[in-house]
């Protein structure tokens, strides 16, 4: 019994040692080895704050958001009486990818040129989290017929 337990422990140790090594500094690098791992819709590196603000339009403001919820874009069709029940209970199924909705956002302002020298700050340098376009008015769906309030939408999803 002691021999088989020792052999099992030794076999486990050898198999763990044989696994390929991963980069230790790769945690949280996100899409393309850049930024936060929660950024599903990255913004291209050459987009400036001014260009991003123009893309959001005059009814929304450019924001940097900490929290993201993704839904839409994926539809699963399950067949049978209990098909997909477990998957939907644990968070899989329809709505696992797609449109990014954000909260805990702070506004990204355009820099005012100092002494006539325009500053073209890149949006990815100003915000390392989720970059989004947020409504200027507070999101409140209580008086709405549909009852839907979309406070912020990922900038990368509309580019």
Swiss-Prot record:
Secretion signal, residue range per the UniProt entry: 1-18
Q: What is its main location?
A: secreted
Task: Please name the GO terms that the record assigns under molecular function.
Answer: structural constituent of cell wall
What does the UniProt entry say about where the protein is found? Secreted; Spore wall
Mark the transmembrane ranges.
Answer: none
Question: InterPro entries in the record, alphabetically?
Answer: Hydrophobin, Hydrophobin_CS
Question: What S-S linkages are listed for this chain?
Answer: 56-133, 64-127, 65-105, 134-152
Q: Which Pfam families match?
A: Hydrophobin
Q: GO terms for CC?
A: extracellular region; fungal-type cell wall
Keyword field contains Ribosomal protein: no
Q: Which domain of life is it from?
A: Eukaryota
Q: What induces it?
A: Expression is significantly down-regulated by the anti-fungal phenylpropanoid isoeugenol.
A GO BP entry: sporulation resulting in formation of a cellular spore
User: What keywords are assigned to this protein?
Assistant: Cell wall biogenesis/degradation, Conidiation, Disulfide bond, Secreted, Signal, Sporulation, Virulence
Q: Describe its assembly.
A: Self-assembles to form functional amyloid fibrils called rodlets. Self-assembly into fibrillar rodlets occurs spontaneously at hydrophobic:hydrophilic interfaces and the rodlets further associate laterally to form amphipathic monolayers.
Explain the purpose of this protein. Aerial growth, conidiation, and dispersal of filamentous fungi in the environment rely upon a capability of their secreting small amphipathic proteins called hydrophobins (HPBs) with low sequence identity. Class I can self-assemble into an outermost layer of rodlet bundles on aerial cell surfaces, conferring cellular hydrophobicity that supports fungal growth, development and dispersal; whereas Class II form highly ordered films at water-air interfaces through intermolecular interactions but contribute nothing to the rodlet structure.
Family designation: Belongs to the fungal hydrophobin family.
Protein name listed in UniProt: Class I hydrophobin 1
* Species of provenance: Aspergillus fumigatus (strain ATCC MYA-4609 / CBS 101355 / FGSC A1100 / Af293)
């Amino acid at each position: 019994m002691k021999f088989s337990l020792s052999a099992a422990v030794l076999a486990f140790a050898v198999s763990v040692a044989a696994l390929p090594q991963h980069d230790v500094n790769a945690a949280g690098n996100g899409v393309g080895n850049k930024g936060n791992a929660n950024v599903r819709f990255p913004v291209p590196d050459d987009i400036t704050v001014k260009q991003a603000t123009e893309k959001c339009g005059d009814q929304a403001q450019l924001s940097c958001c900490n929290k993201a919820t993704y839904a839409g874009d994926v539809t699963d069709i399950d067949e049978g009486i209990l098909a997909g029940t477990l998957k939907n209970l644990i968070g899989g199924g329809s709505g696992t990818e797609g449109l990014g909705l954000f909260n805990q956002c702070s506004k990204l302002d355009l820099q005012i040129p100092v002494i006539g020298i325009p500053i073209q700050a890149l949006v990815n340098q100003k915000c390392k989290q989720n970059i989004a376009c947020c409504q200027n008015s507070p999101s409140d769906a209580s008086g709405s017929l549909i009852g839907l309030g979309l406070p912020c939408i990922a900038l990368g999803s509309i580019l």
